[in-house]
Regions:
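Internal nucleotide-binding/catalytic subdomain
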Residues: 22, 31-45
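Active-site pocket-shaping loop/turn-to-helix segments
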Residues: 44-55
Length: 168
């Protein structure tokens, strides 16, 4: 069926690794958590935009390593997904990050929710995949440290902001 409608427009792609490989969505949820955390800390739109951009760079690097086409990742399933996921309070991962940024514990957030923030469960796997493929994903690795290894959220954010300048 045709999913184009008055309020929604799709595009045509026939590239499995970039569209359905799960790489873009799995990576976008980590960027969303980080963006939510800086939102919860009141750090502003510029910081969130920087994290979103770094998250997109990670999606592209991992996608290319898995033979996805960069142009697919620059479409709706890449940029479209990460833009929505990193900016909308109805995004489960963004709202989880906001709650963490406001000082709530992961355990209390998870107990109070009826929906799943998939980033909580995929972070370690994506971090391991990136390591296995020798793909730099510092944002994803940092979110993994916060969610699964008890890293301090303020130190994690500071570490991301203090990373050496590089071409991204």
């Amino acid at each position: 069926g045709d999913i184009n409608a008055h309020k929604l427009r799709g595009d045509k792609r026939q590239e499995i690794p970039g569209e359905a490989g799960g790489l873009n969505t799995s990576s976008a949820v980590h960027a969303a958590g980080a963006c939510g955390a800086v939102e919860g800390r009141g750090m502003g739109d510029n910081t969130r935009a920087m994290l979103l951009t770094r998250g997109l760079a990670e999606i592209v690097r991992l996608g290319i390593a898995k033979r996805a086409r960069p142009e697919t990742l620059m479409g709706l399933s890449g940029i479209g997904d990460i833009t929505l996921t990193c900016n909308a309070m109805h995004s489960r991962n963004f709202s989880l990050g906001v709650a963490l940024g406001k000082g709530e514990t992961l355990e209390s957030i998870m107990k109070s929710r009826k929906t799943v923030a998939e980033g909580v469960h995929t972070t370690a796997a994506v971090t391991a995949l990136a390591k296995r493929l020798d793909v730099a994903m510092p944002l994803c690795a940092t979110v993994d440290q916060v969610l699964n290894h008890g890293a301090d959220i303020d130190e994690a954010i500071s570490g991301l902001l203090a990373r050496p300048l590089a071409h991204e």
